[in-house]
């Protein structure tokens, strides 16, 4: 058999196998692709030709289309909507340059998508340097089927009256701007079952206070805000059902929170918060992660973490142990303590700072509850940190396991190896309050050898 004939047979066989797939499976596969590629598959065969019209997702990015196309980007999107036949539109994603797309067209497309019982809407307005923002008005905020809404980049949220989004559960506001504070309030108040809110803000501030209120169903809140200008005060949050709080960056001075049902809080950076009661807002949590400076955070008098069972703290900040001592003294039921040194090429030995002082009384959590102690990337050269580790081992009566990890060391660095072996032996030799405590030492492979200290 000639090579060409063999190839033709293999192609035909391959084509036959594809044809045997049920339409439902083909549509499922196509739903993971951008619409431009999905439409292109219609040339494969007669079976594929109508399938793209039934794919429940539409995704357009203006960068995928150039000026050499037969039709403009807006015309292509319009034609796609006119040809599309899926009874339910699961998602509509549109990435565009605001100055190249008529806002009227966007409103038309969103309106058509809403009429198809749209469940997820993603609008990404690329910033090309012109500063022209796409205005997201109240007229685009009436949809009873929408479950997820993401607004990204150069979009102006201008909402003069409460929206109607009875099914919206997830809302992401990523680097968008706001006409005024009432636009935020009108957006949130019209989402009666909203469960997840993500707010990302940049350096430009257009409002003084970001208020999250009238959202009794909110369960998850994420804030990432690196704006530190004087004109922006901060956040006022009233979320009676909030369970999870994540703050990735927060440089504003003000922060007020009412979240009596909060179960977990991860605070990665709140270095500019000056509210003396910041930690007091978190006393209901069971799991807490803190990466804060003890110099800038005041522990609120009388605040007790009665529910806290798991605490993770980062140890980069100067005198971080002062905050640790306070947390141990005020967390009587703590069961898990994790300390993490997130320094890579940053050495703490030369930092100023005071000595660590033992608590006047052994904290109740050490006497009765602490079971797991983990110290990731333990600093072998800092006496204060060895003292803290020794103190916990000596006083944690119910400790089951103590794990110390360190970043790897080159075999040529004999001095470091000797020092770590010495400290390892010292810690392993500590007379522990718990006879059943297992001592574990291991290397943390997530750090590169070149970054070891």
From Swiss-Prot:
Gene3D superfamilies: 1.20.1280.50, Ribonuclease Inhibitor
Residue ranges of domain F-box in the record: 15-68
FBD domain span: 355-406
Keyword Lipid biosynthesis listed: no
Membrane spanning residue stretches: none
LRR repeat locations: 89-111, 165-190, 215-239, 247-270, 282-307, 331-358
Leader sequence segment: none
Top-level taxon in the UniProt lineage: Eukaryota
Keyword Thylakoid in annotation: no
Recorded coiled-coil stretches: none
Keywords, sorted A to Z: Leucine-rich repeat, Repeat
Protein name (database record): F-box/FBD/LRR-repeat protein At4g00160
